[in-house]
């Protein structure tokens, strides 16, 4: 497919002021290792045969990335390609040829789900970041967040998603799933991801969030009791787990007497604060707030892609911070 600009596209590209969307897409264009990502999907992507010629794999991958960055459904992504020139240019498409429709966009997503390729992309990108010296292994921060799913029964099956469950946090009930993550303490990059129903206890997945090379593990009070767990008995690390809020409140009643213990809690909090960065990126930057699909597998595929892109977004932030300080 030729990547030629139409008159409208060329007029757009010659205007002076860059929009925020253009600047963002330009940064992502440069940071994403496209060839590495294409190689993961290529063995599974349809080859050109006697039928309709498929769109270039990289074009479909670029569209898939934009869907996650802007939290767009398949239909909204199709509309955006027609309406927004910067997104068309990023996908290497132009208005003088056919643009992928929502079914084509959906089929690409189904291909990734079917072969669990988002998980492979997550591993590939993390290996690439580790080889580049961005991701370290000294410490792991662990955390989990509840992701709400539609709780209405007003659908075709007249029931809620059976793979999602309800759980109570504080005084509030939530229905949905949980994303458990292990984050590199130095860079704030996510190295492990496990998805479960929302009623899964955070501690049950802790072992699956460790890579085995860390010297310390940092977590909030929800992970109290980790060192005593049978499956974690062989894990030789320093456990930096926050005390329960009630105990911290008791310590603060006698600040002078408990000064050291209080300072240790502040130190633990400052270390684990970085675990919030990946969640903040996917929720605030990418606009992900609710499970879009039915079943854990489809949502796991979306979350694996979101955390892959969040790691690359974070790597870009780190590069720009370094450039500003030099």
Curated annotation (Swiss-Prot):
Keywords: DNA recombination, DNA-binding, Transposable element, Transposition. It holds the Pfam family DUF772. One of its GO terms (molecular function) is DNA binding. One of its GO terms (cellular component) is cytosol. The keyword Magnesium does not apply. InterPro entries: Transpos_IS5, Transposase_11, Transposase_InsH_N. GO terms for biological process: DNA transposition. The keyword Signal does not apply. Involved in the transposition of the insertion sequence IS5. Belongs to the transposase 11 family. This is Transposase InsH for insertion sequence element IS5U. It comes from Escherichia coli (strain K12).
């Amino acid at each position: 497919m030729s990547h030629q600009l139409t008159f409208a596209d060329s007029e757009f590209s010659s205007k002076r002021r860059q929009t925020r969307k253009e600047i963002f897409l330009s940064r992502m264009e440069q940071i994403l290792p496209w060839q590495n990502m294409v190689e993961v999907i290529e063995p599974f992507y349809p080859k050109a045969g006697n039928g309709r010629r498929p769109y270039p794999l990289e074009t479909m991958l670029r569209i898939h990335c934009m869907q996650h960055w802007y939290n767009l459904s398949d239909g909204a992504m199709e509309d955006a390609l027609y309406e927004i020139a910067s997104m068309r240019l990023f996908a290497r498409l132009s208005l003088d040829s056919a643009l992928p429709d929502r079914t084509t966009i959906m089929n690409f997503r189904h291909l990734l789900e079917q072969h669990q390729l988002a998980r492979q992309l997550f591993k590939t990108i993390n290996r690439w970041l580790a080889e580049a010296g961005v991701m370290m292994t000294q410490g792991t921060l662990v955390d989990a967040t509840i992701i709400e799913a539609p709780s209405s029964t007003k659908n075709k099956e007249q029931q809620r998603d059976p793979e999602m469950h309800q759980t109570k946090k504080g005084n509030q009930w939530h229905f949905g799933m949980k994303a458990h993550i292990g984050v590199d303490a130095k860079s704030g990059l996510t190295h492990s991801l496990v998805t479960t129903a929302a009623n899964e206890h955070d501690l049950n997945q802790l072992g699956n969030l460790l890579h085995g090379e860390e010297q310390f593990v940092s977590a909030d009070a929800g992970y109290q009791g980790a060192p005593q767990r049978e499956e974690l008995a062989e894990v030789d690390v320093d456990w930096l787990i926050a005390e329960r809020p009630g105990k911290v409140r008791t310590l603060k009643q006698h600040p002078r007497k408990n000064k050291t213990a209080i300072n240790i809690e502040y130190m633990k909090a400052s270390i684990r604060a970085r675990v919030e960065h990946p969640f903040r990126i996917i929720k605030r930057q990418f606009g992900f707030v609710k499970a879009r699909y039915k079943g854990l597998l489809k949502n796991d595929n979306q979350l694996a892609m979101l955390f892959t892109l969040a790691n690359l977004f974070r790597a870009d932030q780190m590069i720009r911070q370094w450039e500003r300080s030099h």
